[in-house]
Structures are given as C-alpha cells and as structure tokens.
UniProtKB/Swiss-Prot annotation:
GO terms for cellular component: extracellular region. Belongs to the three-finger toxin family. Short-chain subfamily. Orphan group XVIII sub-subfamily. It is found in: Secreted. Expressed by the venom gland. It comes from Bungarus fasciatus (Banded krait). The lineage of its organism: Eukaryota, Metazoa, Chordata, Craniata, Vertebrata. This is Neurotoxin 3FTx-LK.
Length: 78
C-alpha cells in the first residue's frame, strides 16, 4: 500500500508543472503570452518607425535590453 501511494505521488509530481511560469502582455492588443521557463521578465519598448507614429512592443524576455522597460510580475508590462 505504501508503495502504491509513493508511486502515485511521484507520478503526480512528474505530470504536474510545478514550476512557475510568468505571463506577459504581447504586442498584439489584449493578448497574453505564457513565457518560457528561461524568460524571466516582461518587457515593453516604444519604437518610432515614423515621426508621426509609435509602436509599443511587449512580450517575454530573458534579459532587459537597452531602451526597454522590464518587470518580473504577471502582466506588469501593460
């Protein structure tokens, strides 16, 4: 009986994703992305492709690049 219980516990742990995954807003309006395990921060970067327009890029990343605003909690890059 103990062996069966131990086996069930091990199978449950293996089958469940016990790791925390971050969620970030994406560039597409109202979309949410579940980040990969190695992507630990959400980013937001404003890009000006034309003098009269601006695009805000959003998503998951592993490190914060130059000109990006980064944060490490769910949906923090709004």
């Amino acid at each position: 009986m103990k062996t069966l219980l131990l086996t069930l516990v091990v199978v449950t742990i293996v089958c469940l994703d016990l790791g925390y995954t971050l969620k970030c807003h994406t560039t597409q309006f109202r979309n949410i992305e579940t980040c990969q395990k190695w992507e630990t921060v959400c980013f937001q970067r404003a890009v000006k492709p034309h003098p009269s327009s601006m695009i805000v890029l959003r998503g998951c990343t592993s490190s914060c690049g130059k000109g990006e605003t980064c944060c490490a909690t769910d949906l923090c890059n709004r």
